[in-house]
């Protein structure tokens, strides 16, 4: 007997679940194709960049700078010579070197006007004051020397001369008494008492005795110094 052929049944109609999976598979395939296309385009772009890097770039010609103009320096020969300063007028000296200390004597009208002006100025400054005349210094007092004692102006010349002689003697006694332990006296009069007599006594006899005692005390100090 001949074998029996199996009856092939047609495939069952697709269900909703199968349709869903088929659509998902198609989407996956489409995405893969798109990704492949993207990769191809990236490869082409990278190849184009490599080719552009290998090709030499055209040289750019920069414009050459314009030559600077050098400033022309004028030569020394062409420059004009400096002008000389204008000459100042010569001034005549007022006085000679040997007459600078001398002054011309004022004329009579000028001297009279100066005296009148000085008198008016003095009266304006001291209208009520009286003119005082300075006492003249006697020739005897001037001969006594610069170390004279300055006492009353109305003192007689004789007593002033005695004071001027006593004072240097007292100063010499003071120099001799320095460093001496013992104070010497003449007629119970020491250096201090003689100094008071020289300053305050007004009688000529008293001053004469003071001078004699001062000279005796000075001699005593000198003798003591020679003994030492």
From Swiss-Prot:
Effect of substituting residue 190 to G: No effect on nuclear subcellular location. No effect on splicing enhancer activity
Origin: domain of life: Viruses
One record GO biological process: mRNA processing
Pfam families linked: Adeno_L433K_22K (PF11081)
Compartmental location: Host nucleus
Post-translational modification comment from the UniProt entry: Phosphorylated in vitro by human PKA and PRKDC. PRKDC inhibits, whereas PKA activates the splicing factor.
UniProt-annotated stretches for the region Disordered: 1-156
Residue span of region RS-repeat: 177-197
Transmembrane domains' residue ranges: none
Protein induction: Expressed in the late phase of the viral replicative cycle.
GO cellular component, one term: host cell nucleus
Biased composition (Low complexity): 54-63, 104-119
Keyword entries, A-Z: Host nucleus, Host-virus interaction, Late protein, mRNA processing, mRNA splicing, Phosphoprotein, Viral capsid assembly, Viral genome packaging, Viral release from host cell
Family to which this protein belongs: Belongs to the adenoviridae splicing factor family.
Subunit field text: Homooligomer. Interacts with DBP; this interaction occurs at a unique vertex during genome packaging. Interacts with IVa2; this interaction occurs at a unique vertex during genome packaging and seems to potentiate IVa2 and 33K oligomerization.
Domain notes: The tiny Arg-Ser repeat region (RS repeat) is necessary for the splicing enhancer function.
Note: All late proteins expressed from the major late promoter are produced by alternative splicing and alternative polyadenylation of the same gene giving rise to non-overlapping ORFs. Expression of packaging protein 2 and splicing factor is controlled by a L4 promoter distinct from the major late promoter.
Record protein name field: Protein 33K
Native source organism of the sequence: Human adenovirus C serotype 2
């Amino acid at each position: 007997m001949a074998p029996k052929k199996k009856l092939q049944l047609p495939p069952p109609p697709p269900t909703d679940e199968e349709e869903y999976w088929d659509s998902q598979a198609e989407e996956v395939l489409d995405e893969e194709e798109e990704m492949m296309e993207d990769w191809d385009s990236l490869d082409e772009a990278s190849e184009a960049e490599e080719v552009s890097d290998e090709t030499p770039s055209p040289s750019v010609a920069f414009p050459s700078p314009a030559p600077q103009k050098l400033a022309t320096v004028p030569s020394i020969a062409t420059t004009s010579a400096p002008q000389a300063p204008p000459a100042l007028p010569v001034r005549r000296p007022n006085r000679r070197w040997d007459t600078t200390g001398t002054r011309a004597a004022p004329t009579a009208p000028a001297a009279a006007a100066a005296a009148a002006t000085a008198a008016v100025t003095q009266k304006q400054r001291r209208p009520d004051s009286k003119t005082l005349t300075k006492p003249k210094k006697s020739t005897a007092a001037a001969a006594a020397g610069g170390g004279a004692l300055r006492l009353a102006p109305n003192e007689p010349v004789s007593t002033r001369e005695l004071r001027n002689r006593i004072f240097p003697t007292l100063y010499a006694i003071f120099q001799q008494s320095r460093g001496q332990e013992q104070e010497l006296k003449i007629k119970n009069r020491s250096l201090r008492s003689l100094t008071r007599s020289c300053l305050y006594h007004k009688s000529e006899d008293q001053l004469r005795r003071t001078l004699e005692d001062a000279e005796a005390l000075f001699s005593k100090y000198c003798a003591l110094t020679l003994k030492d």
